């Protein structure tokens, strides 16, 4: 009984610390901390593995619109489990580098459709300044295009109290094949999605 009480006390204390730490963050300090996570993400996320996440079948059907079923593309979405799980775990570990809630999302380019980008892996809090719920792929936003062309990370403080750092993902040939969006929120609203 005492062990349960002790464990519960530790969990509550950690959560209160996380909330207090997040609430006391300034935009500048959070930006610096997210930039550090983004720097590590560029080194740790393997672009070759990321390029193997989507199955060939899913990639072929993604841009084909069936006149009888406009949502068939999402029905055909499929991933190769090994590279997906490996990358998802890496992104989840990166998000634990901060003591407050952040997400590390993987955005991937398409070889066949160079003007489009896809959020391939989202994480626990589903935070993003760029993703619209339900969208399989989208035009590349200007901020992402800048990172893709320069190869340099970019910090964006746009939507409300969200701060994102976009950082490139490289394959073994040195080509940029995608981005990681490291995103946090200055003020966490734990009731935001509760209706």
Pin down the residues of each PLM region.
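Short hydrophobic/glycine-rich mini-motifs in sensory/regulatory modules
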Residues: 170-180
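Juxtamembrane extracytoplasmic/periplasmic/luminal helical "stalk" adjacent to the first N-terminal
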Residues: 18-72
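Short amphipathic alpha-helical segments
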Residues: 31, 84-92
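Extreme N-terminal signal-anchor transmembrane helix of membrane signaling/transducer proteins, especially
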Residues: 3-24
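Short N-terminal helix-loop-first-beta-strand/juxtamembrane motif that initiates sensory/input modules
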Residues: 40, 44-47, 94-115
